[in-house]
Amino acid sequence: MDGTLWDSAENVAKSWNEAIVKSGLLKKELTTADIQGVMGKTMDVIADILFPELTKKMRMSLLEKCCQEENDYLREHGGILYPGVAETLAELKKQYGLYIVSNCQKGYIEAFLDHYKLWDYFSDIECYGNNLLQKGENIRLLATRNGLKKAVYVGDIQADYEASKQAGVGFIHAGYGFGTIDDTVPELLTFEELLTFNQRGTIEGAMREL
């Protein structure tokens, strides 16, 4: 989702800084680069990285405040939606079931879908915040829940690739996102290029039987 459909890092940083000030737990200002550096990690790991000066209990307390502030802020203000996302999803939806799996907190995907009014394009969503499962487990869970026979995951960082392998699905790299992949896989230069991939059969070719 992050680095694939949009870049929310700047507004996430703004919202977390608001939450930090309100909490009074520490004096710290996060940057967009700080947030980009932890994109794709589970929320507990993010708290450990960004708030090492706090005890575990205090980190998790602040994390909860940050996540709530973030969800509310993004629902209202959004982030940077990559070019052609809505149009590309509309075309792909005619041929495929579309799903979102993320390591984010509960409510983050919903805030994204609410702001951009993209609910109609997705058949199901799942995230770490709902069940504390790792991304590979959630990809498999969602595939099983929806009776998928084959699937491919589009992601931007190495952890996404590892999760897709764990889940037994194919992988397409969003090369315009936040990371690189240490293997040879189909790579997108833009999200819109998925339509070209589809015309060439690249999406179908990247799928793996489940």
Predicted regions and their residues:
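Short, acidic loop-to-helix structural element flanking the phosphoryl-transfer center
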Residues: 72-100, 110, 136
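Structured helix-beta-strand junction loops
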Residues: 41, 69, 94-95, 149
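Asp-based, Mg2+/Mn2+-dependent phosphohydrolase catalytic module
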Residues: 106, 110-210
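Short beta->alpha linker loops
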Residues: 38, 80-84, 104-105, 130-131, ...
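Conserved phosphate-coupling serine/threonine residues in phosphotransfer and NTP-handling enzymes
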Residues: 4, 102-104
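N-terminal helical cap/lid subdomain that shapes the substrate entry/recognition surface
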Residues: 1-83
